[in-house]
Amino acid sequence: MEPIEQQLTELRTTLRHHEYLYHVMDAPEIPDAEYDRLMRELRELEAQRPDLITPDSPTQRVGAAPLTAFNQIRHEVPMLSLDNVFDEESFLAFNKRVQDRLKSTENVIWCCELKLDGLAVSILYENGVLVSAATRGDGTTGEDITSNVRTIRAIPLKLHGDNIPARLEVRGEVFLPQAGFEKINEDARRTGGKVFANPRNAAAGSLRQLDPRITAKRPLTFFCYGVGILEGGELPDTHLGRLLQFKAWGLPVSDRVTLCDSPQAVLDFYHNVEKDRPTLGFDIDGVVIKVNSLALQEQLGFVARAPRWAVAFKFPAQEQMTFVRDVEFQVGRTGAITPVARLEPVQVAGVLVSNATLHNADEIERLGLRIGDKVVIRRAGDVIPQVVNVVLSERPEETRPIVFPTHCPVCGSDVERVEGEAVTRCTGGLICSAQRKESLKHFVSRRAMDVDGMGDKIIDQLVEREYVHTPADLFRLTAGKLTGLDRMGPKSAQNVVNALEKAKATTFARFLYALGIREVGEATAAGLAAYFGTLEALQAATIDELQKVPDVGIVVATHVFNFFAEESNRDVIGQLLAEGVHWPAPVVINVQEIDSPFAGKTVVLTGSLSQMSRDDAKARLVALGAKVAGSVSKKTDLVIAGEAAGSKLAKAQELGITVIDEAEMIRLLGA
């Protein structure tokens, strides 16, 4: 056997293995970028020796074989995949190939849309009624998932409107919004169920359940992007026109679909979507670019496994492979001990990543991770990089187990793990310098007491030099003492003292949040402040009374009660008040007497506002009798969506909650 034959055989075997893991087992072992690299390598070798191309080569088909647990459906029109480009140069080369094949010098009109990271499905409607649904499978045969697809509320069981074809096969992507993904994993961790690595795996696993009742509990959704069978009817002669027609018939279509009349316009679309990617509320891995004219699509035709008139322009990979060199343990402000993987540095989504969170001991056990392992790292948006899975097939011989500490790595105190919790905590409290540092950093942060100019490095020095032990000590600092810190001159020191003086005037909600009570975020702090009105009333509240606050359950109520029951905490609060920390007296609001469209409503703000600050909006809403919550739930009455609204908007849409924009909010505020 020639060396190139051996190389081709090994590449095909490797790709088939990973196709099986991805398409059939829903348990990919390598990131998409590595699969794409292997596929490109195989194509290049086959281009050198076309006589060695075999019919079963991964380059000659679309996906892996369907599961045998489901009935199979043969696609009357094959479900092809798309070729990929990864940079501007490759896209421009693709654009030129299209123009050359069309023998045209005029710009092509492109229809650009999001490349959703979910599961491709085909849905067949006969006389407007959903009769079957299938996965892509290998492109010619897929799994029958009709019962499961019928449970997805975004997909209509019957189309509405006029001129619906006798047989219409709609193609699109089933996916799981990030809010739904987080909820599924949260429930799984609590019940000991399967935790999914990413939303795509969760969507695929949900859709391939043999019991549709399980699928029905998962908040899957769907966007359509194309057509297969079309009989007994007509569709518009442009891709965008077809999408708009689908929408008119009740099918969900992404609102990020744009016509571009030049290659530069396509590149602008690509970069705008890439910028907005972290706020979409669901995962995408690129944009799809299609010739808009159906006549030109037909003229361009297909290659073996993909159309010539479309391409997927993929973003820089959010997943990459690297090695775990060590694991260290960090201590947070509540004593939580978090394992952090120290990695062989690797570029992920344009950022050099050398650390990744491992969350807790349960996560290490779930991953089966050992020091020295080859792992897949994922970084999405502003999310801290995390280890997705271990590449077990490439585990080195010299790996060693990860041993969780029995004593705090900073102060040496015993660690404990409360039954029912995943987190291990240091019992040292303020004896532990790590907890003191993190508590003080939280206290002065922008959304807490907002002490301008007091950064992490200043806090570290203040604790290490024993200048500060509690938050109250901050307000006793002098410019002279601060001047002794590294890189702190007299002017900078005085600015910090001035900022501390300014921060004394705060709000009750900010003060509560700054105290760092476990499980009390901004929204909960605001809810507690609004409900009790005064610090005295809150300190005197029982656990039962605390649970009367919206969105406060037994766990949060217990943490709040225990915090105020601790004498040292009450002492620190007393010192803070003695140093001059204060806030306005509460304004008693009788909601029943307020004539406002917001009175008595639970409202959630999401996205960025252009006409006023988030705090101003909250204050005005509360003044009109609203309760402003931090998360969307079934109890939410209204969501106000600003620019770049993300997962909260997606969850509101899933739950059918009324959504208004900033302009409508301002109109109602003045009503």
Swiss-Prot record:
Keywords from the named record: DNA damage, DNA repair, DNA replication, Ligase, Magnesium, Manganese, Metal-binding, NAD, Zinc
Catalytic activity: NAD(+) + (deoxyribonucleotide)n-3'-hydroxyl + 5'-phospho-(deoxyribonucleotide)m = (deoxyribonucleotide)n+m + AMP + beta-nicotinamide D-nucleotide
PROSITE patterns on file: BRCT, DNA_LIGASE_N1, DNA_LIGASE_N2
Entry binding sites for Zn(2+): C408, C411, C426, C432
Cofactor(s) recorded in Swiss-Prot or TrEMBL: Mg(2+); Mn(2+)
GO cellular component, one term: cytosol
InterPro entries per the UniProt record, alphabetical: BRCT_dom, BRCT_dom_sf, DisA/LigA_HHH, DNA_ligase, DNA_ligase_AS, DNA_ligase_CS, DNAligase_adenylation, DNAligase_N
One Pfam family in the UniProt entry: DNA_ligase_ZBD
Family per similarity comment: Belongs to the NAD-dependent DNA ligase family. LigA subfamily.
Name assigned to this protein: DNA ligase
Gene: ligA
